[in-house]
């Protein structure tokens, strides 16, 4: 079984979301390096990243950038071909920075920075007559089934379940699942498994020509896949935050 795992440290980690917005988690305030990395991404996958909406996440830094650095980063990313549209919610400093930059905070990222409130202890319920527990009923895992071809420009989302596609996913099409994805035809478009952050989700495909595959936001584009895996039956999984692809034959 052959596999590929490209492992190198990046100045910014880009994750693909299920709503067409990418989250750029900033690891360093080296603006020229961040801009070069984004230019490289856009060059290698222009249909995916060209004019893509991007959320900037400064949560990985010891402190928020100053206004001049943040403005330079936004201008550089725009020149690289993407569109910074918001900041990920973080601290009061990030809140102030978003106001100074004139761009919003994205509320959906709030949960990444706040711990859940502790529920106060509840009084014990009154005693009831003991009843025999019902025998557990085995429930099959939910699966969404797609029998027809997913054509260019279409997006198919399997919420809270796996997705099985019996036909082809065409170039420019996108299939997304909160669970795993099984494709029994050709995958030429994009497949995003574990869309709500499940790192154990996998992608299985009989004929692999994907523009992009992603699991829990971590992604790999076709240009990063060795030629000997293209056109093969493969599985895709996530290991130590790195996408791995291996032939099934």
Curated annotation (Swiss-Prot):
A Pfam family the protein falls into: MinC_N
Q: Which residues form a coiled coil?
A: none
Q: Would you indicate the residue range of the signal peptide?
A: none
Sorted UniProt keywords: Cell cycle, Cell division, Septation
Which InterPro entries does the entry link to? CAP/MinC_C (IPR016098), MinC (IPR013033), MinC_C_sf (IPR036145), MinC_N (IPR007874), Septum_form_inhib_MinC_C (IPR005526)
The reply to whether Cell division figures as a keyword in the UniProt entry is: yes
Q: Which residues does the annotated region (Disordered) include?
A: 117-138
What GO biological process, any one, is recorded here? division septum assembly
Origin, by domain of life?
A: Bacteria
Family affiliation: Belongs to the MinC family.
User: What subunit structure does UniProt give?
Assistant: Interacts with MinD and FtsZ.
Kindly give the NCBIfam families that the UniProt entry links to this protein. Answer: minC
- Which PANTHER family does the entry mention? SEPTUM SITE-DETERMINING PROTEIN MINC
Known role: Cell division inhibitor that blocks the formation of polar Z ring septums. Rapidly oscillates between the poles of the cell to destabilize FtsZ filaments that have formed before they mature into polar Z rings. Prevents FtsZ polymerization.
What's the protein name?
Answer: Probable septum site-determining protein MinC
UniProt source species: Xanthomonas campestris pv. campestris (strain 8004)
């Amino acid at each position: 079984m052959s596999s590929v795992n490209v492992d190198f440290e990046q100045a910014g980690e880009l994750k693909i979301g299920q709503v067409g917005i990418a989250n750029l988690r900033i690891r360093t305030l080296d603006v020229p390096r961040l801009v070069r990395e984004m230019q490289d991404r856009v060059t290698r996958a222009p249909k995916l990243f060209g004019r893509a909406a991007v959320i900037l996440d400064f949560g990985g830094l010891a402190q928020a950038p100053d206004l001049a650095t943040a403005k330079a980063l936004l201008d550089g990313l725009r020149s690289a071909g993407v569109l910074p549209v918001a900041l990920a919610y973080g601290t009061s400093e990030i809140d102030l920075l978003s106001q100074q930059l004139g761009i919003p905070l994205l509320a959906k990222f709030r949960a990444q920075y706040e711990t859940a409130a502790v529920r106060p202890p509840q009084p014990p319920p009154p005693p009831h007559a003991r009843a025999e527990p019902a025998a557990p009923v085995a429930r099959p895992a939910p699966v969404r089934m797609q029998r027809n071809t997913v054509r260019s420009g279409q997006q198919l989302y399997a919420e809270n379940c796996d997705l099985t596609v019996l036909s082809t996913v065409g170039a420019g099409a996108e299939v997304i699942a909160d669970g795993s994805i099984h494709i029994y035809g050709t995958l030429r478009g994009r497949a995003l498994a574990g869309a709500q952050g499940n790192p154990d989700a996998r992608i299985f495909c009989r004929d692999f020509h994907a523009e992009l595959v992603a699991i829990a936001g971590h992604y790999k584009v076709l240009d990063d896949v060795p030629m000997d895996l293209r056109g093969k039956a493969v599985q895709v999984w996530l290991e130590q935050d790195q996408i791995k692809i291996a032939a099934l034959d």
